[in-house]
């Protein structure tokens, strides 16, 4: 995960060519001048993969951290804290969204809004908000009856104060773990939508777009598609391993084991 972040952050320093600059040569195999070869338009594959890391991280951060996490967490905390009709209403909404396959729902949303990176991020954020809502609800139900929270209610503390000062800090750990795991899936969904032509649009470099266009040249120039595929695999694996590590570190039950 750290490797992907560092490559994305230093893309301007470590790429020899502009990712959209077209060289006269086409489908040149990897060599000392072009480390990962050139694509069908004469663009440097290495430079496009490094800049594509920026697109993937940007899509993941916006869709998960800025959309899914806050909206889902608010829904879950409200449902778990107030219960009653609020819990019933929000839980049914979450159940309805869980009834649809994640990728199919994302494709439907982008199909309605139109193909673009922005709409892709909105779609990913919408389909992952229920996951955070369910985790936040379960965690809130577990802490809302603790003695110090009951005591806060008894002395007249408002619901907003209790949620901000007592509930949210106690449910942060599972939400942080889920955020890391969701980032890996968000990168994969963004790549899938771009592969289908619904996500990032040319000439912006995207791993999914590179994989989609490169598949037509698998026999003639396999490097055009293989290297973006490897980049996706490394990024997804890295975030999954980071999520597993955070879970081991933050989950008290696993620490005791």
What are the language-model segments listed below?
Residues 45-78:
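Transmembrane alpha-helix signature in integral membrane proteins
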Residues 109-112, 124, 139-140, 182, ...:
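Glycine-rich helix-loop "coupling/hinge" segments at transmembrane-helix boundaries
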Residues 1-16, 20, 93:
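N-terminal signal-anchor/first transmembrane alpha helix
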Residues 127, 173-183, 222-257:
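C-terminal transmembrane helix and the adjacent membrane-cytosol boundary/short C-terminal tail
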Residues 43-58, 83-91, 141-145, 149-177:
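Amphipathic cytosolic juxtamembrane alpha-helices at the membrane-cytosol interface
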Residues 35, 39, 45, 67-72, ...:
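Generic hydrophobic transmembrane alpha-helix motif, especially the helices
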Residues 54-67, 100, 160-192, 239:
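Transmembrane alpha-helices
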Residues 2-10, 62, 66, 71, ...:
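Lipid-exposed faces of alpha-helical membrane segments in multi-pass integral membrane proteins
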């Amino acid at each position: 995960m750290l490797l992907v972040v560092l490559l994305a952050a230093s893309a301007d320093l470590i790429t020899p060519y502009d990712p959209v600059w077209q060289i006269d040569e086409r489908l040149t195999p990897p060599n000392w001048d072009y480390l990962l070869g050139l694509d069908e338009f004469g663009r440097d594959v290495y430079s496009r993969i490094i800049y594509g890391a920026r697109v993937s991280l940007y899509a993941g951060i916006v869709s998960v951290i800025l959309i899914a996490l806050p909206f889902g967490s608010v829904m879950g905390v409200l449902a778990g804290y107030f219960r009653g009709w609020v819990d019933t209403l929000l839980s049914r909404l979450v159940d309805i969204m869980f009834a649809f396959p994640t990728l199919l729902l994302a494709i439907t949303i982008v199909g309605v809004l139109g193909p673009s990176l922005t709409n892709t991020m909105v779609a990913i954020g919408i389909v992952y908000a229920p996951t955070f809502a369910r985790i936040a609800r379960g965690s809130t139900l577990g802490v809302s009856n603790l003695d110090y929270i009951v005591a806060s209610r008894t002395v007249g503390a408002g619901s907003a104060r209790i949620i901000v000062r007592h509930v949210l800090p106690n449910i942060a750990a599972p939400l942080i773990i889920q955020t890391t795991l969701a980032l890996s899936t968000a990168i994969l969904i963004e790549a899938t939508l771009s592969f289908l032509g619904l996500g990032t649009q040319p000439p912006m470099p995207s791993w999914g777009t590179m994989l989609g266009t490169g598949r037509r040249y698998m026999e003639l120039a396999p490097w055009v598609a293989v290297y973006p595929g490897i980049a996706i695999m490394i990024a997804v694996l890295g975030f999954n391993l980071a999520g597993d590590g955070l879970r081991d570190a933050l989950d008290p039950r696993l620490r005791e084991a």
